Amino acid sequence: MRLLNGKQPLLRHGGAGNRTTATSDYLALRQAQNLMAAAQYALVIGKPLTRHLTIRLEQQGIADTDAVKAIGRLITLLRDHVRKTTNGEIAYIWSREHGAVIGGHVHILLHLPTGYVWKGQRLQRWIERISGKRYRTGTIKTTRIGRTAKAHERNPNLYLANLAIVVGYLVKGTCPKAGAELELERIKAQGRVMGKRCGRSQI
């Protein structure tokens, strides 16, 4: 893998535990329930998920076999930076998908503590470091849940409505039977992925 700015990329091929051949086509009922419960619990403990981050991993040259490790590296970099600059903690849930057009990607819902300064360029540098490739335009998309950083405080009804929509979007790839049991408004297959399909912080 090509070095970037003289630095070794964080993703390295080979080695025990770096790859997995297990695949999945849907989120299982338990996985979807866990993501939904984690989003609700984050709100209860004062760590509302306020940012929706989408990373087009395949577009950035990150193979499906390396996707889980890349997501973990990104979350670790963000967590450590948040701790260093605010002495606070993040919370998150994430779900991977594989689209026919954009390929492998991940949706991450984040809580960032008050006072943390979000900078897109910093995130781009991390993505470059993880992938070992120059940032490709369109790899990162980010929006605020509830439209503003403090929507959960200033307009809680709007925030909760938007949060429900975004979490529903995150779990739309649940298998049809489970989706019906959860009464999801949107159920749509989101492609086959290799390795872990979703995750959450230990909040």
Predicted regions and their residues:
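Right-hand nucleic-acid polymerase module
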Residues: M1-G104, L112-I203
